[in-house]
Every structure is written in structure tokens, then in C-alpha cells.
Amino acid sequence: MSEINKDDIKQEVFDLYDDYAHDRIDRRTFVQKLSIYAVGTLTVTSLMSFLMPDYKGAIQIKADDPKLKSEYITYQSPKGGGTIKALLSIPVGTKKPLGGIVVVHENRGLNPHIEDIARRFALPGFITIAPDALTPLGGYPGNDDQGRELQSKRDKKEMLEDFIAGYDYLKTHKDCNGKVGVVGFCFGGSIANLMAEQVADLSASVPYYGGQPPIEDVPKIKAPLLLHYAELDTRVNEGWPAYETALKENKKEYTAYIYPKVNHGFNNDTTPRYDKAAADLAWQRTIDFFKQKLK
């Protein structure tokens, strides 16, 4: 990232990036509107460089980390996109079956950041699978703009089936103990909410700033929920009060946290929306939750 100070950037700039990252405005409009904030020493180029993901620089667990066995596999999703590619990660030296975690990507396919996240989740003692919903269209193209464009062409219900099929694959894996949870970010958070409603034997669900599921389906939820929201994420948070009311009325097991003064995407350490304090706290809560529910 550049040497721009995050605290010097107006909230409107982060909101503008959120609009762009979620396809509410195109790249041309994003650049045009961003120019309004290019004053003094700030240029559009420097702001763009500051806001865009730095995947290479943020990798924490490399693909060849000796503590993990990470490999690409394929599985079948007959109700979804057919053959789906995924990253499967297992701690080396595992002597007993482990709890499983399905890691669901954002709205741009299985990019390097989510692969890294999947490896991070495996290290504490889980077997993880991170499917790529873009597989039927050739897979993550190596560019987020193209990834978002490709993902917008897929049917969300079919993509949901792809992740449910990934759950089924993991649940019956020889190194899994049969207890499987799901964690998702942004689009993936909405999938985690939907899986809580549609997968009867799901052991745990952790949506990070994910859109809420249909309220009328809340009675179907059996999995315990741990929900992470960002205070400044007004778009996603708008649906939370009604969702929480339904969870309470139906006596569902859930814990929700709204992290103060942070943006949508606060866990993503490849962009300046990242907030280390909130991300670390949410991460530890998530690991503790999975350790409790997937043992």
C-alpha cells in the first residue's frame, strides 16, 4: 500500500469503494467520483493504489507452508455448476479426524486472499475447503474486476448449491469428524446465512458482514450462529434488526457483534478497510466458536 494515512481519508471514499467493489457503480464512474477527493498531495492514482487490494503483500500462510497439506481438488455439484474446483487444506501430522470448515469467498471468486484465509483456518486444527464458484466459467481469472463480472453471470441459487455440495464433500472426507461449519465474507456471509437455513445438520455458521436470509425461513435454522457486523456498513446492517427479531422469536442460538467504527470488509487485510483490532477479535471469537461446535 502507499504511504497515505488511513485516518486522513474521508468515510465517503471508503463508501465509494464499497459501491465499486459491489458493482453498484462501474470503474469509470468510480474513478470520476474519486477525483472529487483528489486534493492537495492526493491524486486519483495514489488513491486508487491505496484502495485496491494488495494480495501478494498480505499473504500470511504461503501455499507451500510445511505445516499444512494444501491442494486443489474437484467435487461434483449436480444441482449447481457441475464439477467445482476447491482448495483443500489439512494440518500435517493429523492423527485423528478434525472438524471441517467451508470457507466461502466474496463476490469475485476464489482469489489469493480467500485461499490464504482458508489456510489460516486450517492451522489451528481444522480441515478446510474453499470452493471457487467461478469454476463453471473458467475459475477466478486473476483479476477482481473480471472476477466480479464473471460471478454476476452465475445464478445465486446454483452457487449456493455448489457450497452445499462442498459441505457434503467435506463431511464425508476421511480426515473429517463429520462436524462441519461454514464461514463466509460479504457474499460469502450471505451464503453462510442461507446454509444455516438450508443445511439441516450444519454444525456452525459464521457470517462476516453478510446479507440476511429470507426471514420466513428463519424457523428452519438449526445451526448455531456467530455473526460479525461492521458499524459503518449501513447497507448490510439495514437488514439486521428484522433478522435478529426473527432469531429471538424462533429461539435460535446466535451471538452477534457489531464492531464500532469499522467498515464492511474489516477482516480483509489486503485493503485499507482492514481494522486489525476488530479483525483479531472477530477471528479469535470465530476460532473459539468453531473449536466448541466442531469437536
Residue ranges of predicted features:
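N-terminal secretory signal peptides
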Residues: M1-T29
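Short beta-strand element of the alpha/beta-hydrolase
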Residues: P97-E106
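Alpha/beta-hydrolase active-site loop
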Residues: E149-H173
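Primarily recognizes the serine-hydrolase "nucleophile elbow" in alpha/beta-hydrolase
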Residues: I164-K222
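Cap/lid segment of the alpha/beta-hydrolase catalytic domain
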Residues: R108, L134-K157, G265-T270
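N-terminal export signals
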Residues: R27-M52
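N-terminal cap/lid segment of alpha/beta-hydrolase-fold proteins
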Residues: Y55-T94
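Short beta-strand/loop motif that positions the catalytic acidic residue
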Residues: L227-Y229
